[in-house]
Amino acid sequence: MQIFVKTLTGKTITLEVESSDTIDNVKSKIQDKEGIPPDQQRLIFAGKQLEDGRTLSDYNIQKESTLHLVLRLRGGMQIFVKTLTGKTITLEVESSDTIDNVKSKIQDKEGIPPDQQRLIFAGKQLEDGRTLSDYNIQKESTLHLVLRLRGGMQIFVKTLTGKTITLEVESSDTIDNVKSKIQDKEGIPPDQQRLIFAGKQLEDGRTLSDYNIQKESTLHLVLRLRGGMQIFVKTLTGKTITLEVESSDTIDNVKSKIQDKEGIPPDQQRLIFAGKQLEDGRTLSDYNIQKESTLHLVLRLRGGMQIFVKTLTGKTITLEVESSDTIDNVKSKIQDKEGIPPDQQRLIFAGKQLEDGRTLSDYNIQKESTLHLVLRLRGGLF
């Protein structure tokens, strides 16, 4: 049959061939006609470079098909790619080829998608945008092909606008890495991104596997409000923790962030600011906590609990106590909060007046119990 070969100069050569001819044979015919040595010829059909040992029929090249002839640049050379199975692949490359290009050639030969390929040379992983000459890879150099771990997976990121972004990640990727990928796709700077999974805000230095984020998990992307800020939390040991917060965060949220960083359960944390213990349901803005404010973290003892004390005026006082505290101790705490001397206080629980030397546990007073405070009259003789 006849086929046509078109050169970059626009000249078209007509060749007589058989469908069983190899690409080698075709190159020899071109040499006979045009004097171009086979090793300087690259033949392209349907966007693919044709390999010497294959036949025209392998590529489904039929009568009157047109091949394109490209002359090799001087940097044209062969390199080898060795897989973990021990197989060696031979590639025709230019020293100006990028690692991307090389991965595409491997895909053409072996069917392995580029995003599953890692190429190693001289102990270094090769970056997609760099060229072979950047790494001083010369003719007959051997690269090593490692397939990405199975941890390679897709996850989804849903924005507040309802848009869903698909990301290719590894389970070993850090949250930082994920934010960079989102920046690449969407242009949102990492420091404006908050990623939420299973109700938790994800911390930059942690990995997807730390949060048990698996393939096809969906993260939620929230853009930081302008109220996004850093605050400091100082522990009794003198250690200072830095937290990323919003002024709309509740004290609960802040305790969860401390748990994520330090492993301390929220119910063992007491947070103090400006001499006040902070209540879980309130927000940072409720307490006028601003950027770079310092909170103090005090750990609750095991028996630590909150109880309430209701006065005759209807006011309710919240106290932090231990079940081993005596009634005396409780009266001292009330004095600290309200300025009422202990000898003017009578405490009632379950209809009983409580005696100073007894403990809360003696009266079976448990967390969130409510005591009633009655003030003694001055002339009273109890």
From Swiss-Prot:
The record's keywords, sorted A to Z, are: Cytoplasm, Isopeptide bond, Nucleus, Repeat, Ubl conjugation
Location in the cell: Cytoplasm; Nucleus
According to its UniProt record, what is one Pfam family this protein matches? ubiquitin
GO BP annotations, alphabetical order: meiotic cell cycle; modification-dependent protein catabolic process; nuclear mRNA surveillance of meiosis-specific transcripts; proteasome-mediated ubiquitin-dependent protein catabolic process; protein ubiquitination
GO cellular component labels: cytoplasm; nucleus
Q: List the disulfide bonds.
A: none
**Residue(s) of cross-link: Glycyl lysine isopeptide (Lys-Gly) (interchain with G-Cter in ubiquitin):** 6, 11, 27, 29, 33, 48, 63
Q: Which InterPro entries match?
A: Ubiquitin-like_dom (IPR000626), Ubiquitin-like_domsf (IPR029071), Ubiquitin_CS (IPR019954), Ubiquitin_dom (IPR019956), Ubiquitin_ubiquitin-like (IPR050158)
Q: In UniProt terms, what function does this protein have?
A: Ubiquitin exists either covalently attached to another protein, or free (unanchored). When covalently bound, it is conjugated to target proteins via an isopeptide bond either as a monomer (monoubiquitin), a polymer linked via different Lys residues of the ubiquitin (polyubiquitin chains) or a linear polymer linked via the initiator Met of the ubiquitin (linear polyubiquitin chains).
Something else the entry says is:
For the sake of clarity sequence features are annotated only for the first chain, and are not repeated for each of the following chains.
- In Swiss-Prot or TrEMBL terms, this protein is called Polyubiquitin
Q: Which organism is it from?
A: Schizosaccharomyces pombe (strain 972 / ATCC 24843)
Primary gene name: ubi4
